[in-house]
Structure formats: structure tokens, C-alpha cells
Amino acid sequence: MRTEARADFSSQETVRYSRNTLLDQVGWEGQARWRASRVMVVGAGGIGSAALLYLAAAGVGRLGLVDGDAVEESNLQRQILYRSADLGRQKVAVAEAALTALNPHCRVETFDQRLNPANVKEVLHGFEVVLDASDNFPTRFLLAECCWRDGIPLVSAAATGWYGKLLVALPGAENPCYRCLVPEMPSAEAVPSSSESGILGAVAGTMGCLQAVEALKLLLGRESNLTRRLLAYDGLAGRFQSLARIKRPDCPLCGQGK
């Protein structure tokens, strides 16, 4: 896909993105795709922080961000968008300023709220790829359903302790959805929060970086191996595993007759 530098990129952009465009799979045509693309990130925590920074740095033209929380002291161990001076400020405001400072060519649209069934379609409208960097199953299930029904590719990541997981749910008759893997919502007691079980910040960041990689590939029109697989990361053992995901005929979201 590599091509000569394009006249519609400024001299500053030409230098900024030169390392991207040297990649055969990107080139200036791919860089132009990224600049014209629209990516939504749900959750500006440990995973979302890393994903947002690398998407902005790569040159994604429009980033959406949903988060209704303020910056807390305990966030700073892993949520690298924020600094000590940001304590008490709303995350989306801090994130917008940080991302714009990193790349002024990137437009950031923020939603200082939590997703719910009443607002999810409006918030996601117009975005080509959605990254689920949330930390709770109600939001994950809501995104899984809305993205699948509206035909939006979903890149979902989670992290706890030393461990992380990543998958891509690409709507299509032959592909499994998120709920083929997690058909029913786990109870709150079965899934402890990071405040209960702990989390290594670098693991959350690793999963956010991998999320950004998958999103950037999708925007180039490249197929992801994770549409039918789950990538599991064990930071303690220093090991990745790629596990098969199967489309379930009885899936409550994408099964037969759905």
C-alpha cells in the first residue's frame, strides 16, 4: 500500500507520520484512511488511556471518548493520560487536552456520561470502530448488542491482576459475537473489581496497546485473526495464548433466528 507522499498532507504531517507510511501495509493511502476514520473508545481508564494515546499518535482523525468519572489518586498507577495535578477533574476533559496536545490534527469528541440503553445508539452513531475499554459487564453487554445489531466492529479488552484478554467481534453470519463467549452476565460477586483484586498498570496498558493495533488494522481493511479467537495474556508467566472462539447456535445475541 506504500505510495509517494500526498499533497493533501502538510509538511509537518509528512514528517510526523513518516514511520507509519514506511510500512508496506500502510503507506500514505493507509495514513489517509486513518486520518478520515472515526473511532470510539468507551472507558478512559488503564486500558483506554493507552489505546487513546496510540490511536491519536497514529493519526486517527476523529476520536470519541465516553467516561463519566473524575480522576482519582488510585487511577494514577495505571491511567497514563492523567497527572497528579488532574485529581478531581473529569477524565474526558483531561483526556481531550492531552490527546490534542499530542496530536493537534486529531479531533476529540467527548461524552461526560455513562452509557445506558437510552443513549448508546446516539453516542456511537457515526463511528466506524468501537473499542470497549470499560470495566464492567453491563457496559460490555450493552456495547456487544448495539455494535452487533448496527454492524460496527467491536474490539473488546479486559484486564485484572496480571492477566488480560482481547477479542474482536466483527458482525457477520459466520463470526462469533461477544456473547458467544460470555452468554450470560456474571454476577457482581463473581467478578471482583480492581479495588478488590488489584491490577498491574502495565498489563492494562499492554491490552490497550493491543486494542489500538487491532483497530488500526480494521481501519485499513485488514482481516483480524481475533474475530474467531481470544487472545489471553499472562503477564506473570510472560505468555500469550490464542484460544479458538466458536459461533454458538444458541447464542442469545447472534444465534439461529436472532
Short names for language-model regions:
Residues 1-258:
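Adenine nucleotide-associated cytosolic modules
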